[in-house]
Amino acid sequence: GGGSSGETNGMWFGPRL
């Protein structure tokens, strides 16, 4: 999403989206 956790690709992020 766009925070600092890690989505599918790893280049994206979670908590912020």
Swiss-Prot record:
<protein>
    <recommendedName>
        <fullName>Pyrokinin-5</fullName>
    </recommendedName>
</protein>
<feature type="modified residue" description="Leucine amide">
    <location>
        <position position="17"/>
    </location>
</feature>
<keyword id="KW-0027">Amidation</keyword>
<dbReference type="GO" id="GO:0007218">
    <property type="term" value="P:neuropeptide signaling pathway"/>
</dbReference>
<dbReference type="GO" id="GO:0005576">
    <property type="term" value="C:extracellular region"/>
</dbReference>
<dbReference type="InterPro" id="IPR001484">
    <property type="entry name" value="Pyrokinin_CS"/>
</dbReference>
<comment type="similarity">
    <text>Belongs to the pyrokinin family.</text>
</comment>
<comment type="function">
    <text>Myoactive.</text>
</comment>
<dbReference type="GO" id="GO:0005184">
    <property type="term" value="F:neuropeptide hormone activity"/>
</dbReference>
<keyword id="KW-0964">Secreted</keyword>
<keyword id="KW-0527">Neuropeptide</keyword>
